[in-house]
Design a protein with these regions (language model features):
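Membrane-interface extramembranous regions
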Residues: 1-135
Length: 135
């Protein structure tokens, strides 16, 4: 049962990245007046906001694919879920750090909660060796 819940969690965490995809493509606003990823400290000045939004969109889809694939790996009882989820968590955290606007206001709009979840996933999987299962 814990593997099923863990797999569902990873799939849902991946799907939340698609909300940030929609935000970055301007398909909808997650919150009124939310402009993420415009003003990203690592890309906006260099590439402009339009290209930054495209890069953020692609990155969010890749992170989503990683988490969904990891969840599917758990459901299918495949050992490869572990490196896939670790890679997705690291990639996702790096994405949100790079697309952060550099300000300390509205951190939750900048992906701070996703970063905290990714850190928790990394601690659980790499340090605590959770979930401890044999396939």
């Amino acid at each position: 049962m814990k593997m099923f819940i863990t797999g569902v969690f990873f799939v849902l965490h991946g799907l939340v990245h698609l909300l940030y995809f929609g935000q970055s493509r301007r398909l909808f606003e997650l919150r009124p007046k939310m402009v993420w990823p415009d003003g990203a400290w690592a890309f906006s000045r260099l590439l402009g906001n339009e290209t930054t939004r495209l890069l953020a969109s692609i990155s969010c889809v890749l992170a989503a694919i990683g988490f969904v694939a990891g969840g599917i790996g758990i459901f299918a009882r495949q050992a490869w879920w572990h490196p896939v989820v670790v890679g997705a968590a690291v990639f996702s955290a790096v994405v949100f750090v790079l697309f952060w606007n550099g300000e300390l206001q509205n951190l939750r709009d900048q992906g701070a909660i996703a970063i905290l979840i990714n850190i928790a996933i990394l601690v659980a999987v790499l340090i605590l060796r959770w979930p401890n299962v044999e396939f």
